[in-house]
């Protein structure tokens, strides 16, 4: 079922949030009013991507389903109609980006991983334009290991040891093997150590008989330059050059610990829970134990970490006392840390979050602040209020018993108010509510199947008592023998993504663990996450003052082209100018409009795909073309540091070595039947005929003439009017669509055009006069494109003009009143290939079916009865298949279910 049918049957059922009992004070009523206004004006969208696999290899396809929700109850969003999904490379640059239409909050897409991509830790990032106004921590941002056995069959085995001397010396040992474990002996290895963008060491080594190199370096600023990478350039015996990036997560064994009093402060005379978090220098939790001592050296309390370096203890702090923690870490190191200062005046919260039906909140005040006053508790998330109540203090405390049934699942902020509008204490909790989860069962007609046998999967969502059982779902089936996975705690899941990670500041270690087989102990562990990482997105000072957050990016409802028409070489707007847009593709014909009094024009509700080029033409009111057209450009989202950086894998090829072997077998079989282009690792050494061609003034970073193909002026046909026409059919491994060149290695990514050293869009090719061209150099092989990094991932065409040393040819392409425009359109989603072995005449029936992703079904929608089904055929290899289904229903209930079958 496709997106359009889903739109036709999906009706989002909004419902109101129940408020609490208790008579509020005028101050609280004002706060609640401001919170409501904030929630209405700045609703929070979240994104989850369901991927078909937890990791990939170069040559693979990444298949994903996107879910965009809004508000605390995770209802499918109608606010934004466009989703951006980026694949960010190890160099922290965007390698691929797609723009996808959202239909009732859902979409689907894919990435093709070209052979030119290197091994490394990639990131898949998703967001709407509206989400860009807020902290990037709310983006969907996941570390994605991608291995390479197509153009890089070298497996690195890295280890780093540290000496915590004043200069922090690091000893590195790296062993290089092939996928079968054989060593790469006598291989030259050039290395460069980069920490936080600074080069701190470089050198050259040759591997020994076991394929090993070893070198030392010193990080003189270990507390400023905490992480980095080792860049390797390897020269193999068969004259290949392989580049690798090995993450260097730390250069120190220095551990740290922080203490977090519940609700922010230790209030004298009150039992106080203090959480703590111990971290190794790589940002991962480390085991620790210790004791708390007062100023007299008396042991007051003891503590020990639970999971991920976190834990908590309780004691009664005394006024005027100072407390120190003595800690021993799991690696044997020790430290002493002062606890926060004890406060003699103030407020505090104590929360019991372990009861099934209610939440107990105790509000404490110091004696000087009691005086029979009232205190108010507000439970909210990003301005959406779920509970508000005011109680009079009895002595120095007030107790609130809050029913859980009306609280949504996920992160909730508890805020305490006294006699003013600014909070006096805050505490974050995670609320568990089964009503926020959609019951989902998976059934197959059998539990055991033969090879290449049809499997029918039946899904049942919800229960008969539900008012609606319509749900949007997606299913991924993988062969676990060919795609080995761990216990699943390192995989992504819809539960932690939408309920936890998007509402927590910073890195959460293995968030899926808290939702896999949850029990009382894991509830306590999750509460430690809240105590150590909970934060408020509300700036209370600004809220009370009526100061609004800056909104730069509006929710996008459709594709648009807009801009302003001005007098030529000036800034004076031209009103009533006629503006016409014409697409060069088949999606859109001609559309025109008239500028307003400010000279502005806007074409909205457009529908076009990525490879569409537009000509925008303007004429003034009298039909004259002596005007300038300036188009609006929304800047692309910058690549910021990922909060999930500690999830990076040090040696990707090694970590998924079994998978890479399996994909090699699969790719070889596909190549045999012409379904995949064969990779030639030695393309870079082909020098026949090419060296005879003289290339002058070339900006080729590999050196003039060092290309996969060179076309000279003499070879260009002068019977063509534009360069793209001249080159069609002449460039090996290059196809043209609408005048735009694509390498057959990366058929969905335009080649990078470099004109006299200036980087240009591929769509500029038709505007270049072929009579002015001296040479055209084509770079397709990894050996030639590697130096261009992510800019060369789709291939490079280097054009040198006959005045190539002038450096300004590209800027001379100008026509008054007309501009060409190649905006990012919608990505044209491909369909997952699913073989049908019931068709005996299938020409591919003899091919070995070595799929790793057995099936991908992104468009499942259950009916009113909660039922849906899909089918697929098993593959060639025996083993255990995992069927994982995720999604949510129209009420925002989240669904996740797993089922296993055996193939013999």
For the regions a language model picked out, list residue spans one by one.
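Bacterial Sec-dependent N-terminal signal peptides
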Residues: 1-30
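Hydrophobic/tyrosine-rich beta-strand signature of extracellular beta-sandwich/beta-rich modules
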Residues: 66, 126, 174, 232-234, ...
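Short, solvent-exposed loop/turn segments in extracellular or other extracytoplasmic domains
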Residues: 102-108, 200, 207-214, 305-310, ...
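Ligand-binding face of N-terminal immunoglobulin V-set domains in extracellular IgSF glycoproteins
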Residues: 109-113, 122-123
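Periplasmic plug
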Residues: 737, 741-782, 806-814
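Beta-strand signatures of extracellular beta-sandwich domains
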Residues: 84-88, 190-192, 289-293, 376-380, ...
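Contiguous segments within soluble domain cores/interaction surfaces
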Residues: 25-45, 50, 56-57, 63-101, ...
């Amino acid at each position: 079922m496709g997106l359009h049918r889903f739109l036709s049957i999906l009706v989002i059922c909004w419902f109101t949030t129940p408020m609490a009992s208790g008579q509020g004070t005028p101050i609280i009523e004002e706060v609640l009013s401001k919170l409501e206004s904030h929630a209405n004006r700045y609703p929070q969208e979240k994104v989850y991507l369901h991927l078909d696999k937890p990791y990939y290899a170069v040559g693979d396809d990444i298949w994903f389903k996107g879910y965009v929700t809004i508000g605390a109850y995770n209802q499918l969003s109608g606010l934004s109609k466009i989703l951006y999904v980026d694949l960010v490379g190890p160099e922290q640059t965007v390698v691929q980006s797609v723009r996808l239409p959202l239909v009732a909050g859902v979409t689907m897409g894919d990435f093709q991983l070209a052979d030119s991509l290197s091994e490394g830790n990639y990131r898949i990032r998703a967001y709407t334009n509206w989400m860009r106004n807020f902290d990037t921590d709310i983006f969907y941002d996941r570390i994605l290991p991608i291995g390479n056995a197509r153009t890089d069959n070298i497996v690195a085995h890295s280890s780093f040891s540290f000496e915590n001397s004043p200069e922090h010396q690091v000893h590195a040992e790296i062993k290089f093997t092939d996928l079968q474990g054989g060593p790469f002996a006598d291989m030259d290895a050039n290395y460069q150590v980069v920490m936080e963008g600074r080069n701190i060491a470089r050198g050259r080594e040759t591997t020994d008989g076991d394929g090993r190199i070893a070198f030392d370096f010193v990080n003189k600023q270990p507390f400023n330059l905490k992480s980095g990478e080792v860049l390797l350039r390897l020269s193999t015996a068969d004259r290949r050059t392989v580049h690798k990036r090995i993450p260097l997560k730390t250069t120190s064994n220095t551990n740290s610990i922080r203490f977090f009093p519940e609700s922010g402060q230790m209030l004298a005379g009150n039992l106080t829970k203090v959480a703590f978090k111990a971290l190794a220098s790589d940002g991962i939790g480390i085991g620790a134990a210790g004791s708390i001592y007062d100023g007299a050296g008396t042991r007051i309390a003891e503590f020990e970490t639970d999971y991920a370096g976190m834990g908590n203890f309780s004691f009664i702090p005394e006024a005027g006392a100072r407390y120190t923690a003595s800690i021993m870490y799991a690696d044997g190191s020790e430290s002493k840390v002062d606890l926060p200062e004890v406060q003699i005046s103030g407020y505090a919260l104590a929360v019991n979050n372990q009861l099934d039906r209610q939440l107990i909140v105790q509000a404490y005040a110091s004696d000087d602040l009691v005086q029979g006053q009232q205190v108010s508790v507000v439970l909210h998330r990003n301005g959406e209020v779920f509970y508000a109540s005011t109680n009079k203090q009895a002595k120095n405390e007030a107790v609130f018993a809050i029913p859980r049934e009306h609280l949504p699942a996920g992160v909730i902020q508890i805020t305490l108010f006294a006699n003013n509008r600014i909070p006096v204490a805050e505490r974050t909790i995670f609320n568990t509510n089964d009503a926020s989860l959609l019951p989902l069962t998976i059934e197959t007609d059998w539990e055991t199947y033969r090879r290449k046998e049809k499997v029918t999967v039946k899904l049942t969502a919800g229960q008969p008592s539900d008012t609606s059982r319509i749900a949007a779902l997606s299913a991924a089936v993988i062969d676990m023998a060919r795609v080995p996975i761990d216990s699943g705690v390192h995989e992504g899941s819809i539960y932690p993504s939408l309920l936890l990670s998007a509402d927590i500041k910073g890195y959460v270690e293995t968030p899926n663990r808290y939702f896999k087989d949850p029990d009382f102990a894991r509830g306590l562990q999750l509460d430690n996450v809240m105590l150590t990482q909970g934060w408020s997105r509300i700036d209370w000072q600004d809220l009370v003052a009526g100061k609004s957050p800056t909104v730069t990016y509006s929710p996008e409802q459709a594709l648009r082209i807009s801009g302003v028409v001005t007098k030529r070489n000036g800034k004076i707007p031209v009103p009533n100018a006629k503006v016409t847009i014409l697409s060069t593709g088949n999606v859109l014909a001609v559309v025109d409009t008239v500028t307003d009094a400010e000279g502005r024009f806007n074409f909205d509700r457009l529908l076009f795909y990525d490879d569409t080029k537009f000509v925008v033409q303007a004429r003034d009111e009298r039909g004259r073309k002596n005007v300038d057209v300036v188009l609006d450009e929304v800047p692309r989202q910058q690549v910021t540091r990922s909060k999930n950086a500690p999830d990076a894998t040090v040696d990707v090829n090694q970590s998924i070595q079994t998978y890479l072997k399996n994909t090699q077998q699969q790719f070889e079989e596909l190549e045999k039947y012409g379904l995949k282009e064969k990779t030639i690792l030695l393309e870079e050494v082909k020098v026949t005929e090419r060296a005879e061609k003289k290339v002058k003034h070339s900006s080729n970073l590999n050196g003039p003439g060092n290309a996969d193909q060179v076309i000279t002026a003499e070879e260009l046909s002068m019977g063509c009017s534009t360069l793209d026409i001249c080159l069609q059919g002449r460039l090996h491994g290059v196809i043209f669509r609408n005048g735009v060149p694509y390498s057959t290695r990366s058929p969905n990514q335009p080649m990078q055009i470099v004109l006299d050293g200036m980087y240009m869009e591929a769509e500029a090719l038709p505007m270049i006069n072929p009579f002015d061209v001296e040479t055209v150099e084509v770079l397709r092989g990894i050996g030639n494109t590697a130096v261009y990094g992510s800019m060369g991932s789709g291939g490079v065409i280097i054009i040198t003009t006959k005045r190539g040393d002038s450096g300004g040819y590209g800027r001379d392409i100008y026509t008054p009143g007309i501009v060409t425009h190649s905006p990012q359109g919608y990505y044209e989603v491909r369909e997952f290939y699913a073989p049908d072995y019931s068709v005996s005449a299938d020409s591919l029936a003899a091919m070995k079916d070595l799929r790793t992703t057995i099936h991908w079904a992104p468009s499942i929608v259950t009916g009113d009865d909660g039922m849906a089904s899909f089918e697929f055929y098993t593959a060639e290899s025996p083993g255990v298949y995992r069927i994982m289904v995720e999604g949510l229903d129209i009420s925002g209930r989240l669904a996740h279910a797993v089922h296993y079958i055996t193939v013999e």
